[in-house]
Structures are given as structure tokens and as C-alpha cells.
Amino acid sequence: MYKEVYFPSNWMICKAAYLFFYEGKSQKEIGSELGVSNVTVSRLIQKAKEQKIVKFVIQEPYLLNLETAKKIEARYHLRECIVAAIPQDNLSENSEKEAVALEGARYLQRIITERDILGIAWGKTMYYLIKYLNPCQRTNAVFVTLHGSIATVDFDLDVLTLTTKAAMSLGGQRYCLFSNGLLDSTENVKMLKKEKNTADILELYSKITISLSGIGALYPKATTPLVTSNYMSQQDYEKLVNANVYGDIMLRFFDENGNECDTDLRDRTLSIELDAYKKIPTKILAVSGVHKAAALKAALVGKMADVLIIDEKLAAELIMMK
């Protein structure tokens, strides 16, 4: 007996594949049209894949982005890396940030539940990310600022504004530090930490399940608004340079190895401690711009991310760095 007697019709395989992939018909509709069961339709479609009658192609740059993300995940031991494609139509100076922010918003809403406590940091990428949250997907989670306010930046980018907007978009309760993030002395920080509102929030930090932050770059060139907007004095900045600063996250400054810079800014800052931050189960970093590559690498070496969301140009630069 010829073995071919057990083979399905090639025509039927092609027809089922055509109806399914080209015409978008359901397996039930195809079964009715071809006079076979849904199970047979499923097998015909599988045969079309096995015999390479149908071929799946992921177009560039999407395939390259997927492969780059996989490499970054392996190199830095990340739970997930998402590389956002930059749309080529209607390009603007914020296209990279917006692409990263949109992916960040969708990722956050994919994982957040009403049992979560979400810590939020300041920044322009965070501004767009929260802007893109879908208010139809309300979670009733808890939202908390990861640090104090920054008087020298745009009101819309401040952590207090962003945390309030996130709570309004997704539903839930917000907890905020209402004082400035950088204070004049360590004594003022100690006094604030004794106040009930501040003490309650600092205690809440140990219960945060998800954090959402960007990073700022201070190497090879300082582009972070914490430097360019006079957040700190020139003397403070020079101390950071002498401490080999590479970047900032949640008002904390870190070096090439992701360790916090040892200057008096550390004790004058009202923000979650880096050690406490690193214990958060899901740390999401959303970063855009190739100028942040060195700072981002330092943050990843310092284990500051579980999930990384970046634009395709920054991803390519990160892969090229040793």
C-alpha cells in the first residue's frame, strides 16, 4: 500500500491556509465551506506550516528589535526587554520618548493588579507613559511617589503631578511626599522623616511591588535636567563628577558600576534608598535617547531593572558597548 493514502490533499491544505490567513475566516467557517470538521481544519493549517506552504515573515525593523531585545535580556539577566520601533511618519523631537512611553504604558497595564503598590518617579518619559494609560483598564492599585518634588522642573513632569494623574487614570489611592526632593541639610531630611506623612510613605516603600522610572545621563555629557535646570549647585555637581557619576535615578546618583555616588547629596535627598529600590520585585525602566547609553549600562550593571523598555537606536548602541 502506498504511504500516500494517508496523506491529506495538498489542495485542501493550500485552500485551508488561504482561507485562514488571506481571507481571515475562522476554522468553523472553513470547516463548513470545505465540508470537514474544525479538528481537520486545524490539522490542515498545521500541515501548511510544516510543509512550508505558508511562511511567516516579521518585517524589519521589528525582527531586528526582537533579536536585539533577546540579546539584552541575556546580557543583563532581565526578565524582559522591549525595544520600541520609532515610527518614521510624523517624526518629532519626542518620537523616541513617545514610542517608549506607549510600550511602557501597555506593559504596565498588562501586569498591574489591584494588589499592587506602584512607585513612580519623575521625568518626561514618565509624563508620556502616564498620558498613554488607558482609563478603561482601571485596577484600583496604590500609587506612591518614589521621591520628593523638584522645584526647578516643569510642573507636568514633577513626580507629584505624575502620581496624581496615574491614580486618576487607573483608579486607586495615591500617597505623596509633598516636600522637595533635595534639601539644604541632612538635619532637615532627618526632621522630615520624623513627620507622620513622610514616615508612613517611607514605610510604604518596603511594600512596593512595581516601580516605574527613567534615568538621567551625566556621562559623557550631563543632559539630565537635574544639572541643566539648576536643581543642584555647581559645587554639588563638581562633587559628583569627582565621584565618577554616570547617571541618576529617582534623584539618586550612581557611578559606572551602578553604585551610589558617595557625596553629601545622598544624605540631603528625600527619596527611596537605592538598596530598598533594588528589592522591589518588578523594576521597570523606560529610557530613550542614545545619549543615555553609558548611564543605562551602568544602571543595568547595578541591577536597577527587571524590565527594560527602550527605543531601537538606544538598544543598538547598548549592544555595541562592551
Residue spans for each PLM region:
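Catalytic or ion-translocation cores adjacent to nucleophile or general acid/base/metal-coordination motifs
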Residues: V142-I150
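Glycine-rich beta-strand-to-loop/alpha-helix junction loops that act as flexible
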Residues: A121-T125, E312
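Structural signal for conserved beta-strand scaffold positions within catalytic alpha/beta enzyme cores
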Residues: I82-A85, T145, C176-F178, L285
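Conserved phosphate- and dinucleotide-binding cores of soluble alpha/beta proteins
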Residues: E4-W11, K15-A17, Y22-E29, G35, ...
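Key DNA-contacting residues within the recognition helix of helix-turn-helix
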Residues: S42-L44
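A generic, well-ordered mixed alpha/beta core segment in the N-terminal half of proteins
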Residues: I117, M126, K165-A166
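HTH-adjacent hinge/linker in prokaryotic transcriptional regulators
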Residues: E4, Q46-I117, K131-T139, T152-F155
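Generic hydrophobic alpha-helical segments
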Residues: A16, V100-L108, L129, I201, ...
